[in-house]
């Protein structure tokens, strides 16, 4: 019984702890369309088994509420190698900020909310 309870908890908790379910929410055509609009774009690569990615997800859940005029785009690194290659992203946990077509900043492995927000603010 304890094992069943533990399994249920391990399944339920991840679905509620991040505030949103991180999925791939764009393709390259959508990215180019948003870039042409001149908007600020934040791209984050992730992997479902990555603890740093999970920590970033918590920050991005709040950031999407705090930066309403910014487009947040996420993709699963190992399942969308075309996106990774086109953007020159080699690692999970990479955060790239664009202002339109111009890359403003790029960091790998940030989990500190202030540092992530500072990176986002560079594109605003």
Label every model-predicted segment.
Residues 87-96:
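Structural micro-motif
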Residues 17-21:
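Boundary at the C-terminal end of the N-terminal hydrophobic targeting segment
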Residues 22, 45, 64, 69-82:
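Thiol-based oxidoreductase modules, predominantly thioredoxin-like and allied folds used
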Residues 45-59:
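Conserved redox-active cysteine motifs that mediate thiol-disulfide chemistry
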Residues 99-124:
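Non-catalytic, surface beta->alpha helical segment in thiol-disulfide oxidoreductase systems
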Residues 38-41, 45-49, 91:
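Short pre-active-site segment immediately N-terminal to redox-active cysteine/selenocysteine motifs
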Residues 4-13:
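Sec-dependent N-terminal signal peptides
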Residues 22-40:
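A short beta-strand-turn-helix
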